């Protein structure tokens, strides 16, 4: 059976119903310009949205203490849902709203991701709801519960001019690169940078294979060695090369993972608001 290449992607947008994310909608709007999408909004109560972020952010198991007295403004929730559907209509985007959950919210969202191509979350909400002490643990555990790839989008999202692909030779990093390539063919003409950590080896793992894989989708690609004692080099590259998107696998506790946590997540992703695409298998 041959799959029709012009299929409609199903995109999940998980958001706190009391806050509308301009960045998330801009991302979906840009996707729809390249290929039709079905935007499925999952409107969660504030308390459930915070729990979703904590759980998908990989916070250690245990009780989450959230103010039970959070006031939910039903009028504001309805206004934001109406705003979302109206904007979708104005931009020719097929959309649905799911806000009637019969299961525990995390089980429901995980089930939704099983039948979706991509989950989109506002990185602004993510960082506002995670304390400083938990942000450094983000990459190792990010969104392991999702059954589809995930992208964290900043509020000032712009279509990237450059794609950075984090590579450590692991199957997870290769899987993330492949998933990104499948989902975003419109980015194949962008400048791509394969980044790996120089641990004293003469070459990167499986060089011929990874070059063949990337060159087939991203003809304008180059390789960047990130030296162990030069993490700031990567930050400087991000700052000096315009709008950038980072592609990463769900790394284990490798050296690359430790470097990403300390340099990318806390400094680059937070302060410079770079969108990050994460996929795991």
Task: Describe the predicted segments one by one.
Residues 2-64, 145, 158-226, 243:
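Small/aliphatic-rich secondary-structure junction motif
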Residues 43, 123-124, 249-251, 280-281:
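Short secondary-structure boundary segments
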Residues 63-78:
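A short acidic, glycine-rich active-site loop
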Residues 95-152:
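Hydrophobic alpha-helical segments and helix pairs
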Residues 152-158:
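Flexible loop/hinge segments that line or gate small-molecule binding clefts
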Residues 273-281:
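Short, flexible loop segments at boundaries between secondary-structure elements
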